[in-house]
From Swiss-Prot:
Organism annotation: Salmonella schwarzengrund (strain CVM19633)
Cofactors named for this entry: pyridoxal 5'-phosphate
Gene name of the record: bioF
One Gene Ontology biological process: biotin biosynthetic process
Reactions mediated catalytically: 6-carboxyhexanoyl-[ACP] + L-alanine + H(+) = (8S)-8-amino-7-oxononanoate + holo-[ACP] + CO2
Domain of life: Bacteria
Role played: Catalyzes the decarboxylative condensation of pimeloyl-[acyl-carrier protein] and L-alanine to produce 8-amino-7-oxononanoate (AON), [acyl-carrier protein], and carbon dioxide.
Pathway: Cofactor biosynthesis; biotin biosynthesis
Protein name: 8-amino-7-oxononanoate synthase
Family recorded in the similarity comment: Belongs to the class-II pyridoxal-phosphate-dependent aminotransferase family. BioF subfamily.
Annotated EC: 2.3.1.47
NCBIfam families: bioF
Amino acid sequence: MSWQQRVDDALTARRATDTLRRRYVVSQGAGRWLVANGRQYLNFSSNDYLGLSQHPQIIRAWQQAAMRFGVGSGGSGHISGYSVAHQALEEELAQWLGYPRALLFISGFAANQAVITALMKKNDRIVADRLSHASLLEAANLSPAQLRRFIHNDTQHLSRLLQSPCVGQQLVVTEGVYSMDGDSAPLAEIQHIARRHHAWLLVDDAHGIGVTGDEGRGTCWQRGVKPELLVVTFGKGFGVSGAAVLCSESVADYLLQFARHLVYSTSMPPAQAQALSASLAVIRSDEGGERREKLAALVQRFRAGVNASRFTLLNAHSAIQPLIVGDNSHALRLAEALRQQGCWATAIRPPTVPVGTARLRLTLTQAHEACDIDRLLEVLHGAGE
């Protein structure tokens, strides 16, 4: 088979099963409204949960830092790209979340891959929740360690897998809030089981940090859990982009030596780091608390309204509210029907989610108003008839 035939066959297979992904060009996409092709839509696909991407204080911090530092970092943090802005943000994150150290990464995907591939060796085992993010599972597959996956949030299955003999070390991998189902992991029980088997725990709290817990400290803090490795990302609750790994002093020193994504990547712009410090200040403030309260009220309003409809609603109390449709083509048609009525929603299909669980992945943000939720419910009920 030629290279071209391989490419063509893969695309043909995706088209045949209604799983071909596409990008949409938008002129505005992060806030309450999404604008595409000159039309304005209520935006129910953004992960800017607290609406901070449009916050004037954060925008101003980025602008001021860009004037001071320029628009790029100029190198890896090991060469010349570790600025005072990066150092300040790492120290603020570590203090906020109660860890000795924080290390910045350019993305959550890079952070997850860096940590897992740097730590895991040939005789080790990774035990990951079956619904873990693609970055975690891909990193596990790329590492020399054995990968075992436990049934989603099934702690008994997790325990059985950890009990089987392992020559090396074991790492349990889970998420705080799951990106496609919107539900939370039983973190306290998972941590208890991991410690009983002398395993380390890695929690990716991309969708919880900033949004849940005291001062927005996330799902782990809310549940009284302190994993050995906590990954937080900045594209959701923080409204910016990038990520950080929270860990011990020795693990941070180890990652600085062996995490290739950290060593061999140009670091995030200092202006971005300073904007993230400004975002953290908002998250920790009374204003941040008010934004979280408003978001929680909007989620409650949506769930109360949609329960009477014909859609399958998962047990999710986060900003992520998936409506399970099942059939791929039905999910696409439903998303298009909502767009025709001025509501922008995204159809999620395999391989992102398991076969037979295609869905509308609706995300609510603090930027929405109660009338927006009511309009979404009205359109959903009409589209579902």
